[in-house]
Design a protein with these regions (language model features):
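Acidic, PIN/NYN-like endoribonuclease modules and their adjacent C-terminal/linker elements
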Residues: 1-7, 110-136
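Short, well-structured N-terminal submotif of metal-dependent ribonuclease cores
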Residues: 1-45, 61-67, 129
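Active-site phosphate/pyrophosphate-handling residues
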Residues: 13-14, 55, 107-108
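Regular secondary-structure segments
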Residues: 34-38, 77, 94-98
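Active-site-proximal, substrate-binding regions of enzyme catalytic domains
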Residues: 53-79
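Active-site neighborhoods of divalent-metal-dependent phosphate/nucleic-acid chemistry enzymes
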Residues: 81-118
Length: 136
């Protein structure tokens, strides 16, 4: 029986070095890795928590505008070799983030909510985000 295909869990620093190309040593390595993922010779999983950290760092540290953050991360998520069972929800969350004043965590919660998966929060943003939620 063949062994299962290896999937790489991609850390925030790899995504940031790839997107920003701001490190002489790690930028080219990140680019090579992401090219391998794009070509299909490697599979990479981009977890929601990594997306959150990428948004935070790009927004707060690099002061990149929301629309650019969303564009960059959406392009990453749409790479052929990127896997994530919640990919469509994360992409939806990025759109919510771009079009609101809510933070990315609230946007992910809203995107993942449904009548059977209700967000509980004191935050009123969820109504504007069209989430299934209950306020206490």
């Amino acid at each position: 029986m063949p062994s299962p295909e290896k999937v790489y869990l991609i850390d925030t620093n790899v995504i940031l070095r790839y997107l920003l190309n701001d490190h002489k040593r790690f930028g080219p390595k990140a680019k090579t890795f992401m090219q391998d993922v794009a070509e299909g010779s490697k599979k990479g999983e981009l977890l929601s928590v990594v997306v959150v950290e990428c948004v935070y760092v790009m927004e707060k540290f690099y002061e990149i505008p929301k629309n650019e953050i969303v564009d960059k991360l959406s392009r990453i998520l749409n790479i052929k070799g990127i896997v994530n069972p919640d990919k469509s929800k994360i992409l939806d969350a990025l759109v919510k983030y771009e079009n609101s004043n809510a933070d990315i965590v609230d946007c992910i919660l809203a995107a993942k909510s449904s009548p059977q998966r209700v967000v509980v929060s004191f935050d009123k943003d969820f109504k504007r985000l069209k989430a299934s939620y209950e306020s206490y």
